[in-house]
Amino acid sequence: MIGILGGGQLGRMLALAGYPLGLSFRFLDPSPEACAGQVGELVVGEFLDEGALLRFAEGLALVTYEFENVPVEAARRLEGRLPLYPPAKALEGAQDRLREKTFFQGLGVPTPPFHPVDGPEDLEEGLKRVGLPALLKTRRGGYAGKRQ
C-alpha cells in the first residue's frame, strides 16, 4: 500500500492513475471530507499529530505527498520509518519558489526570468530586469493560481 500525505484532488488523481497498476492507497488529511477518501483509505488527522502519523504509516510500503505544501516535519518523521519519495530535503526546497528556481538554474534547467522581491523597493528593479508583462508570486504557500 502507498501512503499519500494529503487527501485532496491531486492525491485522488494519483490514486486513480495507480489503480490500473494494481496499487492501493492510504491518505492522511486533516479533513474528514477529503475527496481522496473516495478512492482509498483515509486517516483523518493533522499532519504533525504523532498518533495520526503512526496510524497512517502502519503497513505502508512507501510514502509520497500530493503537493509541496505538506509540512516538512511530517515528511521527516515518516522518512525515518519508511521510504519517502521525493525525500524531505526535496520537499523543503520545493516549498520556497526562489530557492527552487535558483536550484534549477544552477543545474542548467531553463527557467523564466525572475527577480527576488523582498519589499516594495525590489519591485521596480525586478520589473527592469524581467520586463513587462510580469508575474509576482509569493515565495511560499499557495498553489494552482491561489496565493501565487
Regions found by a protein language model. Name each.
Residues 63, 110-113:
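PLP-dependent amino-acid enzyme catalytic core
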Residues 112-114, 134-148:
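Glycine-rich phosphate-binding loop of ATP-grasp-fold ATP-dependent ligases
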Residues 1-102, 121:
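ATP-binding N-terminal substructure of ATP-dependent carboxylate-amine bond-forming enzymes
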Residues 23, 109, 132:
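Short glycine/serine/threonine/alanine-rich loop segments
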Residues 41-43, 92, 112-116, 148:
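Structural signal for short hydrophobic segments within the conserved structured cores
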